[in-house]
């Protein structure tokens, strides 16, 4: 049991029982990929895999932190008086980053904490282990220091840590999906305005299967920033002809009028993906509300094809998973999720076919790629909570 391991590790390292236990989920995005930074709608939900913590407040200004995921690093110690980024401090830079941003915003944090964490999200798999950790830390500090941070502000704080302290140019989706997570609901989020709406995820006799390629992807040094630049360049071109502030403000029909202004064929395809994907999100949410799971699944498939052909962020591993998933009985739809270039895909599969699905897709993947994929049946959980 994870919580017992967490407690005993805390006692072994710090010589006392932790006062509190916490959990923060990871996330999957059901549809709406690579458009959070293009002003589009996304449709993520929190999952029951995530990051657990045991924590206690200290009486001095020292923080001590230990991760069961990085045991070789041992206990990492630092003071509230020096919260500068240090590469050797590894994962605890997320703790330091959250502390630094909160203190700079005027929140009163005058004591250190002892912390042990243990995550069961596969690292680098695109299930937002870093956002899960950020939202976990905000929750712990909010609880210990009675900071009254709203869920939306918590997400914005996490994004600020990611962008300004860690140095990853990510959007708001991951932190938002986790911070505002509610059981059995997905969140339709407009990344421009932060308008959001909860949509019950009624999947009937079907489950969401997460398929991990086990090919690590690193957001910062993948082609993520290259795609962002291609979209930003295209937007700059289009702004000369139409009054928009983001690509996803255009419909496919409107884009037809202006598409010849974008001379680079790669950039043109990136625009086609962003604009069509935004429309797919709206159609998918409508389908879900009308209980049309078949259409929802078809839109997932179309999303993957667009990410493969127009946005070019899938790669052999993700394509092997998705394309083999489409052939299986009982499958409504399948697509990559997250930034791509490795990481995970998801499928919606009829419960009666889940075992067969995992066996067949797993075998096809191993035959094609040479190593195994991992499969998880996902449940949609709550946002960060004290246990």
From Swiss-Prot:
Signal peptide: none
Keyword annotations: ATP-binding, Carbohydrate metabolism, Cytoplasm, Galactose metabolism, Kinase, Magnesium, Metal-binding, Nucleotide-binding, Transferase
UniProt binding sites for ATP: 67, 124-130
Enzyme class, UniProt record, top EC level: transferase
Family: Belongs to the GHMP kinase family. GalK subfamily.
Swiss-Prot/TrEMBL site (Transition state stabilizer) positions: 27
Subcellular location: Cytoplasm
Residues at the active site: 174
PANTHER family per UniProt: GALACTOKINASE-RELATED (PTHR10457:SF7), MEVALONATE KINASE/GALACTOKINASE (PTHR10457)
EC number: 2.7.1.6
Purpose: Catalyzes the transfer of the gamma-phosphate of ATP to D-galactose to form alpha-D-galactose-1-phosphate (Gal-1-P).
Residues where substrate binds: 33-36, 224
Single biological process term from Gene Ontology: galactose metabolic process
Transferase in keyword set: yes
Pathway: Carbohydrate metabolism; galactose metabolism
Positions that bind Mg(2+): 130, 162
Main location class: cytoplasm
GO cellular component, one term: cytosol
A GO term for molecular function: galactokinase activity
Protein name per its UniProtKB record: Galactokinase
InterPro entries linked to this entry: Galactokinase, Galactokinase_bac, Galactokinase_CS, GalKase_N, GHMP_kinase_C_dom, GHMP_kinase_C_sf, GHMP_kinase_N_dom, GHMP_knse_ATP-bd_CS
Reactions catalysed according to its record: alpha-D-galactose + ATP = alpha-D-galactose 1-phosphate + ADP + H(+)
């Amino acid at each position: 049991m994870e919580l017992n391991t967490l407690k005993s590790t805390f006692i072994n390292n710090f010589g006392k029982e932790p006062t509190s236990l916490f959990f923060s989920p990871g996330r999957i995005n059901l549809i709406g990929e690579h458009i959070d930074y293009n002003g589009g709608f996304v449709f993520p939900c929190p999952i029951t895999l995530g990051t657990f913590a045991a924590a206690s407040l200290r009486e001095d200004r020292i923080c001590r932190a230990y991760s069961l995921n990085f045991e070789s690093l041992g206990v990492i110690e630092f003071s509230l008086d020096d919260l500068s980024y240090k590469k050797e401090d590894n994962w605890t830079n997320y703790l330091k980053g959250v502390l630094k941003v909160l203190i700079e915003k005027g929140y009163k944090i005058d004591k250190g904490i002892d912390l042990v964490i243990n995550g069961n999200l596969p690292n680098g798999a695109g299930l937002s282990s870093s956002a899960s950790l950020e939202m976990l830390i905000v929750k712990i500090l909010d609880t210990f220091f009675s900071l009254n941070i709203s869920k939306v502000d918590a997400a914005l704080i996490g994004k600020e840590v990611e962008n300004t302290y860690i140095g990853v140019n990510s959007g708001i989706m991951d932190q938002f999906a986790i911070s505002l997570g509610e059981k059995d609901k997905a969140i339709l989020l407009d990344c421009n305005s932060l308008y959001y709406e909860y949509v019950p995820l009624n999947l009937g006799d079907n489950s969401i299967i997460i398929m991990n390629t086990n090919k690590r992807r690193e957001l910062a040094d993948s082609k993520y920033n290259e795609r962002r630049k291609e979209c930003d360049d295209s937007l700059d071109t289009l702004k000369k002809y139409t009054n928009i502030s983001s690509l996803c403000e255009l419909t496919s029909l409107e884009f037809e009028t202006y598409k010849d202004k974008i001379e680079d064929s790669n950039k043109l395809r990136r625009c086609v993906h962003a604009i069509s994907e935004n429309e797919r999100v709206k159609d998918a949410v409508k389908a879900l509300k009308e209980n049309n799971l078949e259409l929802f699944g078809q839109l997932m498939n179309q999303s993957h094809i667009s990410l493969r052909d127009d946005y070019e962020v899938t790669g052999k591993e993700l394509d092997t998973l998705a394309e083999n998933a489409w052939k299986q009985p009982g499958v409504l739809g399948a697509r990559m999720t997250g930034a791509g270039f490795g990481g995970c895909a998801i499928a919606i599969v009829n419960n009666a076919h889940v075992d067969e699905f995992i066996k067949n897709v797993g075998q096809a993947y191993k035959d094609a790629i040479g190593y195994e994929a991992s499969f998880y049946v996902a449940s949609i959980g709550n946002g960060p909570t004290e246990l």
